[in-house]
């Protein structure tokens, strides 16, 4: 099957036209309009330093429903000890850059290339992209970032500089997203790490149907502040 080359105008082909590995289209740009259109259609960018922009919609899709979150006994003990303090949107760009600097098994370079960093920083300034940070004292120890649309959160990447820091940030992020009535967390493709937290694969058709329902909910746009109570500041 031929790979669809994106036109200048913002549009995407039907995700059902994706290759078996999930590759759907090539080209385009990382403008806020195109990125938000992609996420709303269940499509995300993922490419390397020496390739054009590639767009994906894998089948099956890895998702986490907050009510299915599994926390191991050892991680629960770490959380109870209070080693890390978790915040939201305090260090978005730092989190993205730390994620970009992490080597991944089987990858020669990073997929979070400079233009990707710039694109998500723009989304953050527009109130659609968010980070959760784990701090040890005043040091950023770990974190994650993603995109929020309607009642869905699209996780992008995480990092840890200290033991369990990203895991603590992840657990707290899921707990807060559930409190804000986010019911669908997109984890994109299966990893054993996320599966241990309770993430599971579902058919793409089911994911898109659930995403459509999630998008009927209002987007929690703006800077998130975990000290703001039951709703993030700006929402």
From Swiss-Prot:
EC number: 2.3.2.6
Family recorded in the similarity comment: Belongs to the L/F-transferase family.
Role summary: Functions in the N-end rule pathway of protein degradation where it conjugates Leu, Phe and, less efficiently, Met from aminoacyl-tRNAs to the N-termini of proteins containing an N-terminal arginine or lysine.
Source organism of the structure: Anaeromyxobacter sp. (strain Fw109-5)
Protein name: Leucyl/phenylalanyl-tRNA--protein transferase
Coiled coil: none
Subcellular location field: Cytoplasm
One protein family per Pfam: Leu_Phe_trans
Cellular-component GO terms for this entry: cytoplasm
InterPro entries attached to this UniProt entry: Acyl_CoA_acyltransferase (IPR016181), Leu/Phe-tRNA_Trfase (IPR004616), Leu/Phe-tRNA_Trfase_C (IPR042203), Leu/Phe-tRNA_Trfase_N (IPR042221)
Catalytic activity annotation: N-terminal L-lysyl-[protein] + L-leucyl-tRNA(Leu) = N-terminal L-leucyl-L-lysyl-[protein] + tRNA(Leu) + H(+); N-terminal L-arginyl-[protein] + L-leucyl-tRNA(Leu) = N-terminal L-leucyl-L-arginyl-[protein] + tRNA(Leu) + H(+); L-phenylalanyl-tRNA(Phe) + an N-terminal L-alpha-aminoacyl-[protein] = an N-terminal L-phenylalanyl-L-alpha-aminoacyl-[protein] + tRNA(Phe)
HAMAP family: Leu_Phe_trans
GO molecular function, one term: leucyl-tRNA--protein transferase activity
Keywords of this entry: Acyltransferase, Cytoplasm, Transferase
Record NCBIfam families: aat
EC class of the enzyme, as a word: transferase
Xref: Gene3D superfamilies: Leucyl/phenylalanyl-tRNA-protein transferase, C-terminal domain (3.40.630.70), Leucyl/phenylalanyl-tRNA-protein transferase, N-terminal domain (3.30.70.3550)
Keyword Oxidoreductase applies: no
Gene Ontology biological process terms in this record: protein catabolic process
């Amino acid at each position: 099957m031929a790979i669809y080359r994106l036109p200048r105008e913002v549009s995407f082909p039907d995700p059902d036209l994706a290759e078996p590995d999930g590759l759907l289209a090539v080209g385009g740009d990382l403008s806020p309009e195109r990125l938000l259109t992609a996420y709303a259609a269940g499509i995300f960018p993922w490419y390397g330093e020496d390739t054009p922009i590639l767009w994906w919609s894998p089948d099956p899709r890895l998702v986490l429903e907050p009510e299915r979150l599994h926390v191991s006994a050892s991680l629960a003990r770490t959380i109870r000890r209070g080693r890390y303090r978790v915040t939201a949107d305090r260090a978005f760009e730092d989190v993205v850059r730390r994620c970009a600097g992490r080597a991944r098994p089987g990858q020669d370079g990073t997929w979070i290339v400079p233009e990707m960093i710039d694109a998500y920083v723009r989304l953050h300034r527009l109130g659609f992209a968010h980070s959760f940070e784990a701090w040890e004292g005043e040091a950023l120890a770990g974190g994650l970032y993603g995109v929020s649309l309607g009642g869905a959160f699209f996780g992008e990447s995480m990092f840890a500089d200290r033991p369990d820091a990203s895991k603590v940030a992840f657990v707290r992020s899921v707990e807060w997203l559930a409190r804000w009535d986010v019911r669908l967390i997109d984890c994109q493709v299966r990893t054993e790490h996320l599966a241990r937290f309770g993430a599971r694969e579902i058919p793409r058709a089911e994911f898109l149907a659930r995403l459509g329902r999630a998008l009927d909910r209002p987007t929690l746009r703006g800077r998130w502040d975990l000290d703001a109570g039951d709703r993030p500041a700006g929402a």
